Amino acid sequence: MISLKYLLIIFSLLFNSLSSSKDIYLKDLLKKDGIFYEKFSHTPFTGKITGLLEGTFKKGMKYGEFIKYYSDGKILSKINYFENRLNGSWLEYYRNGNLLRKKTFKDDLLEGEYIDYYSFGQILSKRSYVKNKLEGIYKEFYKNGQLHIRKNYKNNILEGEYIVYHEYEFEPVVQIKSKKYYKNGKIEGKFVGFDENGNKIKEGFYKEGKLEGVVFNYNKFGKVLSKIVYEDGLLIEAISYQ
């Protein structure tokens, strides 16, 4: 036969568990030194919050998926935490329900693929992070899906080839609009520009991020239209042949 003392212990444990796991709103919590408390309480909050932001707290820290809503009830974002730190996927949505942004965190730092989307679902840009720093190829796309910009990062700094492409409304053509190079985050060396038919219309040089020497402008037949002379980024002379 279960004793009265044993029943009282069970009841006490159940009551404490229920009271410590109650659902409240974010406005009912206060944050102190990174830990969340209920107002007028000195005990770190454990439980769930409801309303425009839903999620779970354990001992004053965010755990698991937190969902934020627009005022009309549609999902705005889904963010994952572990012990108050961003861990896992971070998803943001347009009001129409389509994905706006997708990224991943590890121990509060961006890690892996990061993608932005147009409101109709097409990819806008794509890049990768390693410990919160951009690393590797970064691509941007026109609304029709054609490649717009292709550049490269090394340890969060632009490095190597930076290419911009023309946009073609109907034809699946990949035509370079401009090409330049980066070294340690600064434009370095030759740059060149092309028209929509692939004709070279501009070329010149950069030195440590500044224009240096002669910049040539051409018409579509290759004839020089003008020469502009730079020194340490400053315009020295401009000559027109038109």
Segment roles from a protein language model:
Residues 16-242:
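Glycine/tyrosine- and acidic-biased, solvent-exposed loop/turn segments at the edges of beta-strands
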Residues 1-7:
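Bacterial N-terminal signal peptides that target proteins for export
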